[in-house]
Structures are given as C-alpha cells and as structure tokens.
C-alpha cells in the first residue's frame, strides 16, 4: 500500500529551503518554521512546529500515563476486545452516530499533496459536512505550482492524471465477474482506510467534485460507520465507494484491482491497531 508521509515536503527549485505545497488559504511556510509566538493565535492553524513542553506539563503528562497504566485489562478481556473490536465500534457509532468527531476541514490545507498535481480546484466546506459548517472555504492551487516533487508514495505511473486503462475496466474475467469495478473510469484514485463516519471523506469529496476523473474509496471494519457514510446526503456512487473491510486481514479482497491507487490515507488508524496485527497492513 501507498502511505502518505506525515512529514511530506516539496522542494523548491535551485536547492532552496523545503516548503509545503502552496495553499490559497494559509500562507506558504517552510516546513518546520510555523512557530507559535503568540498564545492567543493558537487556533489559527491546526498544528505548530517545535512545540516544547514545560517541566510542569511534562510531569503532568507522565502522571496521567502512570494513572492510565495502573489498571490493566485482564488477558482474556484483551483477547475479547481485540477479536470483537468491530462490534464495539458498531456500538460506538450506534450511540454517537456522526456527532462525536468533527470534520477534518483542515486536511487538504495541511496536506495538499493528497490531491493530483497541477489541478485548479476549489475546496468547498459547506452544508454537505456533518457539522453543517456555515461558511465555505475557497482555495486555488495554481497550475504554476512550486511543488515539483510530491513525496506521496505513488503507484508506478501515477500522480499525474493519465488516460484510463481499458484493461482495468473489466479486470475480473471470471464467471459472474464481468461488471466494471467502482471507479474503473477514473484517472486519479484515493483510498481512505478507517473512514469512520466520513469526517475526512466529505471534506475530500467537496474538492474532488471539481476534479474530473477523480474517485474516492473509503472503508471501515465497522458496518455502522460505513452505513453512516452511505446515508450522507453528499455520498454519491458516481464518485465514492464505501465498503466494509478489515485491512489487517490480508485474505480479504478489495473491490478494485491491485496497483491502481494514487494515494492511500490513514488518519488516526495505525495507532488504534495492535502492533502484531499492524504487520499485515
């Protein structure tokens, strides 16, 4: 699988200091140079560089870790929670629906590398979001971009928008498998693993709808989460395919052939998987 490096950078010409891809919402800042000097402006960006804890903050964090580790889960309970994890997440989504997590409207501003290069797009964050954001955010990624290298690990021949591969349109030649797969006509494809209620899905779709030939796959091992995505008013099978899938089970098939993805996105996913199972991703 492709992985989006959280430390993605774009290098300017002539060996200048690394910069992130240009964003029309936030000013271009060299990677590592976004320093919080005024605490009153802490919410102006989603993240800040080189934040250092005070001695008091470090001691408080250590105390919390010790408190959390004081009570351990019994081994038999660990097995149950691990084997039935999807069921517990189903209960979570049955209880909280789409109200627990906020939409990641910052995602494409902080990581514009997710989108195809050299695309003119407008990011619309509006009523199609779960949290019904009232305002819309416009951003334009110019055709003369500073980013010459994306550092998003690509599939061979990807990252640009190429012509559709006719061999992919009916990749399943076996009996009963003659239908084109979802997104078979797309030229740029993203997969989000662990989509939950769609808090990354719909901010991304708001932008992808302005990029012809793009398609978004999203999966979760909790069936309730997938149903929440499919029930959203902005969900369209013409540009998105949501499906149930456990990425730790390498015996499960995907609804698309190997080698067609341009970007794979995992947001707060790896940290929730047992290290032993993460080896199968």
Swiss-Prot record:
Record-linked PANTHER family: METHYLTRANSFERASE-RELATED, TRNA N(3)-METHYLCYTIDINE METHYLTRANSFERASE
Catalytic EC class: transferase
One Gene Ontology molecular-function label: tRNA (cytidine-3-)-methyltransferase activity
Organism whose genome encodes this protein: Mus musculus
Recorded family membership: Belongs to the methyltransferase superfamily. METL family.
Consequence of gene disruption: Mice were born with normal Mendelian ratio without developmental defects. Cells show reduced N(3)-methylcytidine modification in mRNAs.
Protein location: Mitochondrion; Cytoplasm; Nucleus
Protein name as it appears in the record: tRNA N(3)-cytidine methyltransferase METTL8, mitochondrial
Record text on subunit structure and interactions: Interacts with EP300.
Single Gene Ontology BP annotation: tRNA C3-cytosine methylation
Keywords, alphabetical: Cytoplasm, Isopeptide bond, Methyltransferase, Mitochondrion, Nucleus, S-adenosyl-L-methionine, Transferase, Transit peptide, tRNA processing, Ubl conjugation
Position of the Glycyl lysine isopeptide (Lys-Gly) (interchain with G-Cter in SUMO) cross-link: 80
Disordered as annotated region, ranges: 139-180
């Amino acid at each position: 699988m492709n992985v989006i490096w959280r430390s993605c950078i774009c290098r300017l010409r002539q060996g200048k200091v690394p910069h992130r891809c240009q964003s029309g919402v936030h000013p271009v800042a060299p990677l590592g140079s976004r320093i919080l000097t005024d605490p009153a402006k802490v919410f102006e960006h989603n993240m800040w560089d080189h934040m250092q804890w005070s001695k008091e903050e470090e001691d408080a964090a250590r105390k919390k870790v010790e408190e959390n580790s004081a009570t351990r889960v019994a081994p038999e309970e660990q097995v149950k929670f691990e084997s039935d994890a999807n069921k517990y997440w189903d209960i979570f989504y049955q209880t909280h629906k789409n109200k627990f997590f906020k939409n990641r409207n910052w995602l494409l501003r902080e990581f514009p590398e997710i989108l195809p290069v050299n695309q003119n797009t407008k990011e619309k964050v509006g009523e199609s979001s779960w949290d019904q954001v009232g305002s819309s955010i416009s951003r334009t990624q110019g055709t003369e971009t500073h980013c010459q290298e994306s550092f998003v690990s690509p599939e061979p021949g990807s990252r640009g928008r190429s012509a559709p591969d006719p061999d992919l349109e009916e990749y399943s030649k076996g009996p009963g498998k003659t239908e084109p797969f979802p997104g078979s006509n797309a030229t740029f494809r993203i997969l989000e693993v662990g989509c939950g209620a769609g808090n990354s899905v719909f901010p991304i779709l708001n932008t992808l709808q302005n990029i012809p030939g793009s398609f978004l796959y999203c999966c979760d091992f909790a069936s309730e989460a997938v149903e929440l995505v499919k029930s959203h008013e902005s969900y369209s099978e013409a540009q998105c395919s949501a499906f149930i899938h456990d990425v730790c089970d390498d015996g499960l098939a995907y609804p698309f052939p190997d080698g067609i993805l341009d970007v794979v996105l995992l947001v707060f996913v790896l940290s929730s998987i047992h290290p032993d199972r993460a080896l199968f991703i």
